[in-house]
């Protein structure tokens, strides 16, 4: 797109690229009118190739935009007193079934165990799965 201006902005841990053009919808067909969870989100063939080759980077982008990594604290009352258990987990939330499907497919390619904790939330809570996802996602800056 020779007529659109592009600029790069250095940020901690990444470089943010900005560009404004009315032709982005031609290159990225999933962008369109209406809410994303009310229309079909479908990757173009060239995007599918990239997502298949780089599922870790794709998952990182998804979790950095619509996900979080936190620590759950669970309280149990036992005969010998109260016990607290803590464990790390990831959650990814999105109203679009298509985006949730794409996220799940990327996690499957990475060998990360996941499940739906709600209709619109993907949960990664098993210790090994969280450790595996940590290799790709990392902290938000």
Language-model-detected regions and their locations in the chain:
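Internal intein/HINT superfamily modules and their associated LAGLIDADG
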Residues: 1-141
């Amino acid at each position: 797109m020779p007529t659109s201006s592009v600029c790069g902005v250095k940020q901690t841990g990444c470089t943010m690229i900005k560009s404004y053009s009315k032709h982005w919808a031609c290159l990225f067909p999933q962008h369109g009118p209406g809410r994303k969870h009310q229309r079909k989100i479908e990757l173009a063939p060239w995007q599918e190739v990239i997502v298949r080759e780089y599922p870790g980077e794709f998952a990182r982008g998804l979790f950095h935009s619509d996900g979080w990594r936190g620590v759950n604290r669970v309280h149990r009352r036992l005969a010998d007193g109260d016990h607290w258990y803590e464990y790390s987990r990831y959650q990814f939330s999105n109203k679009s079934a298509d985006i949730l499907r794409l996220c799940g497919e990327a996690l499957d390619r990475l060998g990360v165990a996941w499940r739906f904790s709600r209709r619109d939330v993907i949960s990664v809570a098993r210790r090994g799965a969280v450790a595996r996802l940590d290799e790709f996602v990392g902290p938000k800056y």
